C-alpha cells in the first residue's frame, strides 16, 4: 500500500505524509522515493520505536495498537530511520479508550494507547542517548510544523514567546495519580521517566504544569 501511494503521488506531484510507519520494508520504499519526491514525509510513533512484537506475547491489550508492533529488525530499522532523517516525525499515538472497552479479552479490545503526556519523556529516557536531544525536538516539534506549513516559532527580540520549558534530567514516575488523561489504557504505569515539562509559554503567556 505504501508503494502504491508513492507511485500515485509521483504521478500527481503532490504532497504526501505517512503518519505511522511500522515496517522496515515500508521505510525502504520511502527512503528511495524521497530521492525524487520533494514533498514526501513520514513518521512513526514513540511506541513503535520502543517495542516490538514480543511485547504482545502475553496478549496484553494495553499494548494493542494499529499498525501492530513488528519484529525487532523492523524496530531497529525505524530507529535508524529517525537517526538518518528518513523518518521526519515521532508521534505520541495518543488514542484513549474508555475503561469499559478495554476490560475485555485481547481479541475484543479496541486498538489504542494514551501517549501525549509521556511521549517526550519516553524519548528522553530511551532514545536520547541514541539520537540526541536535538533530533527529538526536531521530530516532535519543528518537523511537524514544517510539514503542516505552520510557522516555526523563533526566539527573537520583538517576537511573541512560544516555547516549552522542560528539565531533561528530572526523574519522575508515571502512575494513575499523575495521569492527566481520563483514560487509562497504557502499559506504562509505574515507569520511571527522565524529562519533566514545567510548562509552556504561548504568545508570551505562561501556562504552568500543575503536576509536581
Model-derived features with residue positions:
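Histidine/acidic residue-rich metal-binding segments in metalloenzymes
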Residues: 1-90
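Glycine/Thr-rich phosphate-binding loops of Rossmann-like dinucleotide-binding domains
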Residues: 26-27, 50, 98-100, 173-174
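C-terminal cap of metal-dependent C-N hydrolases
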Residues: 108, 160-212
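Short, positively charged
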Residues: 68, 132-133, 176-181
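Residue-level signal for inorganic ion chemistry
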Residues: 16, 43, 93, 123, ...
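A short acidic, glycine-rich active-site loop
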Residues: 63-74, 110-114, 186-195
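Short glycine/proline- and charge-enriched loop/turn segments
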Residues: 56-64, 101-109, 180-184
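His/Asp/Glu-enriched, well-ordered alpha-helical/loop segment
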Residues: 1-13, 83-84, 89-90, 95-168
Amino acid at each position: 500500500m505504501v508503494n502504491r501511494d508513492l507511485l500515485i503521488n509521483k504521478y500527481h506531484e503532490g504532497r504526501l505524509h505517512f503518519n505511522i510507519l511500522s515496517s522496515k520494508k515500508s521505510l525502504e520504499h520511502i527512503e528511495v522515493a524521497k530521492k525524487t519526491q520533494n514533498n514526501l514525509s513520514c513518521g512513526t510513533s514513540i511506541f513503535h520505536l520502543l517495542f516490538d512484537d514480543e511485547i504482545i506475547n502475553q496478549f496484553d491489550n494495553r499494548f494493542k495498537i494499529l499498525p501492530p508492533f513488528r519484529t525487532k529488525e523492523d524496530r531497529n530499522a525505524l530507529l535508524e530511520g529517525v537517526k538518518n532523517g528518513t523518518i521526519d516525525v515521532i508521534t505520541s499515538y495518543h488514542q484513549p479508550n474508555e475503561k469499559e472497552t478495554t476490560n475485555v479479552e485481547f481479541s475484543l479490545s479496541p486498538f489504542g494507547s494514551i501517549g501525549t503526556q509521556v511521549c517526550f519523556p519516553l524519548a528522553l529516557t530511551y532514545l536520547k542517548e541514541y539520537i540526541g536531544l536535538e533530533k527529538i525536538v526536531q521530530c516532535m516539534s519543528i518537523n511537524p510544523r514544517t510539514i503542516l506549513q505552520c510557522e516555526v516559532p523563533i526566539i527573537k527580540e520583538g517576537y511573541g514567546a512560544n516555547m516549552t520549558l522542560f528539565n531533561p534530567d528530572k526523574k519522575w514516575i508515571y502512575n494513575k495519580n499523575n495521569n492527566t488523561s481520563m483514560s487509562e489504557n497504557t502499559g506504562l504505569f509505574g515507569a520511571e521517566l527522565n524529562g519533566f515539562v514545567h510548562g509552556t509559554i504561548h504568545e508570551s503567556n505562561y501556562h504552568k504544569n500543575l503536576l509536581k
